[in-house]
């Protein structure tokens, strides 16, 4: 449970405000979901509770620029910055999807200084399950 810490605010009428105590985590899991249109990076603790997340769309990219590797790199940097502020030092990386931003997001995480213990590709692959949709004709 998160404790609330009383904090005096001298700027606004001297009111006492309650502020959340940020969770300190040393280990975590970084999930990269790279779809064909967007890349979503979610940072969780070991139990799966979300610490931070970012996507190419939330990083300010709109339209077709969301699918670029640079947009994925920016999204990964934004998500990791918040995780480092929470005290994360080492993480596992789970990559899902066929998108263009897979490698760029992983490169950005490697450059961030977090020690990577495990890198897994968890893209769902059918064992000849459902029939795929018909091919697009453009």
UniProtKB/Swiss-Prot annotation:
Subcellular location(s): the record lists: Plastid
Entry's Gene Ontology molecular function annotations: rRNA binding; structural constituent of ribosome
Q: Name one Pfam family in it.
A: Ribosomal_S11
Q: Which GO CC terms are listed, alphabetically?
A: plastid; ribonucleoprotein complex; ribosome
Which residues lie in coiled coils? none
Q: Which organism is it from?
A: Cuscuta gronovii (Common dodder)
Q: Give the family per the record.
A: Belongs to the universal ribosomal protein uS11 family.
Q: Which gene encodes it?
A: rps11
Q: What is this protein called?
A: Small ribosomal subunit protein uS11c
């Amino acid at each position: 449970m998160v404790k609330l810490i009383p904090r005096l605010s001298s700027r606004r009428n001297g009111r006492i405000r309650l502020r959340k105590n940020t969770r300190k985590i040393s280990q975590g899991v970084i999930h990269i979901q790279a779809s064909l249109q967007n890349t979503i990076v979610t940072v969780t603790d070991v139990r799966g509770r979300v610490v931070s997340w970012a996507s190419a769309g939330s990083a300010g990219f709109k339209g077709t620029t969301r699918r670029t590797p640079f947009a994925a790199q920016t999204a990964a940097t934004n998500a990791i910055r918040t995780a480092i502020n929470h005290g994360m030092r080492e993480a596992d990386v789970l990559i899902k999807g066929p998108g263009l931003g897979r490698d760029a997001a992983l490169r950005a995480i490697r450059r961030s200084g977090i020690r990577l213990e495990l890198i897994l590709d968890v893209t769902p692959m059918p064992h000849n399950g459902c029939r795929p949709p018909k091919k697009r004709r453009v």
